Amino acid sequence: MATLFDILNTLNNNNYFENCKRQCSINKSNKTIIDIIPPMDVTMTNDKLIIETELAGISKDHIEIDIKDSILTIQGEKKKNLNKQQQQLVIEKSTTSSTTLDSKEDEASIEEFEDDIKPKSKSTVTTTATKENKEDENKTKLSDKKFISERSFGNFKRYLDLTKVLYQLDLNSINTQFENGLLTITINKKLHYSNTIKININ
């Protein structure tokens, strides 16, 4: 029979790097690319199980939590926030692409193009080159210079095996709280529990 120390030792993931390797191997089998494995603290008190996971910079709308086959899974996506200049570039790109599509729809027929090709070819090339130069200048002005880039973005996932303590927990009492980048999951323990089920003979 496992002691309380054994249970806590398993839950707290003391060997963090080995746990990361195990989770990465599971993710590979599911063909899911995981960019972030968030750190976690697990505490068992006399009346509850407390799971704290650091998810700084992540919106609660991008977090999913579920329990399946005694495995608690916390997953989601940490998206990169765009500043005003980057948002403006995205808008300009979308506007340029839509303008290009409109211009293609309004293209002249072959006959009209052949009649006007000689007098308009030089001015058209010059105008196009000028527009491209202006766009390059605007992009250069709007682009930011990054000196340090250490933050991680992308998909995150963390598993917690509850097999050894699941019989003690009241899953109907699960409570979650997300504040200041810290996700706290609290599960109350049952008032009366046992890891042994007595079977009567009829």
Swiss-Prot record:
Cross-referenced SUPFAM superfamilies: HSP20-like chaperones
Keywords: Stress response
Domain sHSP residue range list: 31-202
Induction summary: Down-regulated by Pseudomonas aeruginosa, PAO1 strain and PA14 strain infection.
Superkingdom: Eukaryota
Matching InterPro entries: A-crystallin/Hsp20_dom, HSP20-like_chaperone, HspG1-11-like
Record has rRNA-binding as a keyword: no
Residues covered by region (Disordered): 96-138
Similarity annotation: Belongs to the small heat shock protein (HSP20) family.
Protein name: Small heat shock protein hspG5
UniProt gene name: hspG5
